[in-house]
UniProtKB/Swiss-Prot annotation:
It comes from the Bacteria. The keyword Metal-binding applies. The gene is aroB. Its EC number is 4.2.3.4. Belongs to the sugar phosphate cyclases superfamily. Dehydroquinate synthase family. Pathway: Metabolic intermediate biosynthesis; chorismate biosynthesis; chorismate from D-erythrose 4-phosphate and phosphoenolpyruvate: step 2/7. PANTHER family: 3-DEHYDROQUINATE SYNTHASE, 3-DEHYDROQUINATE SYNTHASE, CHLOROPLASTIC. Binds 1 divalent metal cation per subunit. Can use either Co(2+) or Zn(2+). GO terms for cellular component: cytoplasm. It is found in: Cytoplasm. The keyword Metal-binding applies. This is 3-dehydroquinate synthase. Keywords: Amino-acid biosynthesis, Aromatic amino acid biosynthesis, Cobalt, Cytoplasm, Lyase, Metal-binding, NAD, Nucleotide-binding, Zinc. It comes from Staphylococcus saprophyticus subsp. saprophyticus (strain ATCC 15305 / DSM 20229 / NCIMB 8711 / NCTC 7292 / S-41).
Length: 355
C-alpha cells in the first residue's frame, strides 16, 4: 500500500507493506553520506538486515538507546557532535529506524545538523505509524514533553510491517492507542469495527488485519495535516487524549500510548461535563481492561501535580488549558477547560479506579 502527502509542494511517499525496506535503497543511493540511526532493541532483533543495509550503502550506523531517554538536550548534544566529527556534508541523509522516539530524535537531528539535512522515517512500531507521518520532530525539556522541536518533513516514510513481528505486547498496547484515537476521530463505525476486531488481549496480540487499521489511521492523519501542517487549527484534533496523557506520561514515565489511552478516558469525562455528552465511561474502562492495559498507576495520581504539567502543554494559549474533546464520535473540537472542571473530571475519573 502506498500513500502520498498532498501539500502544495515538497510531498513525500508513505509505503506500508511487508518487505517495504526493499524500497530504501532507491531513496538513498545518490547521497554522499548516509547515517542509520537505530534503536538498540531493533538493532538487536534485526542486526543482520541492518548490517546488510549499512554495508550495501556504504553507510554509517549509529545505535541509540531505546525510548524517550534519547530525547534530552544532553544526548542530543552528544549525538550531533559525534555526527559533526564525521565531517558530513549537507548531502547527507539520516535514516530513523525505530519507534516514535527514534523518529522524533533523528528528525530533530536532521532539522538542525548543518542547518538541515534530509531524513527518512523507517518506523518499527505500531505507535510510530502516527509519529512518523506529519513532520513533527523534537526532544523533551525538564519543563515537559516535546517542547523543543520543529516541523520538518521526511523525504519518505518506509513502514515495513515485518518489524512488528518482534514487538512485545506492551509496545503493541502503546501503539494501539493511536490507532484507536484515529478511529475515534473518524466515526462510530470505525470505533465499532476496531473494537470488534480486537475485543481482548489475545485478539490484539495476534495483530490480525492490523495493516488495514494502520492504513486507515495514516489516511485519517493525512486528511487532517494537509489542511493544517503547523497545528494552528484542525491539526490540534490529533492531540485527542494527549493533554492529560502527556502529563501522566511525563510524571510517571509510562509508555506513551498507555498514557494516551488514560487521557482519552479523561477526555470523555470532561466532554460529559462541559459538552453535555453521555459517554459510557465504564464501557471504555472495561475495554482497556479487556486489552490488559496496566492501569494500576492511576491509583498514584494527584491532581495538582498533573494540572501543573497540563498548564505547560504547548497547545495552550493565554486563556489556559486547551483540550480536544469529542462532541460526538468523529466530531472533535478544541475547548478551553478551567481548573474547576478539570478537577471535577479528575475526581470522577479516579473514583472509577478506587480499590
Amino acid at each position: 500500500m502506498k500513500l502520498e502527502t498532498t501539500y502544495k509542494s515538497n510531498n513525500y511517499p508513505i509505503i506500508v507493506e511487508h518487505q517495504a525496506i526493499d524500497h530504501l535503497h532507491q531513496f538513498i543511493k545518490d547521497y554522499e553520506d548516509v547515517v542509520l540511526v537505530v534503536d538498540e532493541h531493533v538493532n538487536h532483533d534485526w542486526h543482520e538486515l541492518l548490517d546488510f543495509i549499512t554495508s550495501e550503502n556504504n553507510a554509517h550506523k549509529l545505535i541509540i538507546p531505546s525510548g524517550e531517554t534519547t530525547k534530552t538536550l544532553s544526548f542530543y548534544e552528544k549525538t550531533i557532535e559525534s555526527l559533526l566529527a564525521k565531517q558530513l556534508t549537507r548531502d547527507t541523509c539520516l535514516i530513523a529506524i525505530g519507534g516514535g522516539a527514534t523518529g522524533d530524535f533523528t528528525g530533530f537531528l536532521a532539522a538542525t545538523l548543518l542547518r538541515g539535512v534530509d531524513f527518512i522515517q523507517v518506523p518499527t512500531t505500531i505507535l510510530a505509524h502516527d509519529s512518523s507521518v506529519g513532520g513533527k520532530v523534537g526532544i523533551n525539556s525538564k519543563h515537559g514533553k516535546n517542547l523543543i522541536g520543529a516541523f520538518y518533513r521526511p523525504k519518505a516514510v518506509i513502514y515495513d510491517l515485518n518489524f512488528l513481528e518482534t514487538l512485545p505486547y506492551t509496545e503493541i498496547l502503546s501503539g494501539y492507542a493511536e490507532v484507536y484515537k484515529h478511529a475515534l476521530l473518524n466515526d462510530i463505525t470505525s470505533v465499532n469495527n476496531i473494537e470488534a476486531q480486537y475485543p481482548n488481549e489475545q485478539a490484539l496480540a495476534s495483530l490480525k488485519d492490523i495493516e488495514y487499521f494502520l492504513y486507515k489511521g495514516i489516511e485519517t492523519k493525512l486528511n487532517i495535516i494537509v489542511q493544517d501542517e503547523k497545528e494552528s487549527n484542525v491539526r490540534k484534533y490529533l492531540n485527542l487524549g494527549h493533554t492529560f496523557g502527556h502529563a501522566v506520561e511525563y510524571q510517571f514515565k509510562i509508555p506513551h500510548g498507555h498514557a494516551v489511552m488514560i487521557g482519552i478516558i479523561y477526555q470523555f469525562i470532561v466532554s460529559n461535563i462541559i459538552l453535555n455528552t453521555h459517554y459510557d465511561i465504564s464501557h471504555y474502562i472495561q475495554y482497556l481492561k479487556s486489552l490488559n492495559y496496566p492501569l494500576e498507576v492511576i491509583q498514584s495520581f494527584e491532581f495538582n501535580s498533573l494540572y501543573g504539567l497540563m498548564l505547560k502543554d504547548k497547545k495552550n494559549d493565554q486563556q489556559g488549558v486547551q483540550m480536544v474533546l469529542l462532541n460526538a464520535i468523529g466530531d472533535p473540537q478544541v475547548k478551553h477547560v478551567d481548573k474547576a472542571t478539570l478537577s471535577q473530571a479528575f475526581e470522577i475519573f479516579t473514583t472509577h479506579f478506587e480499590k
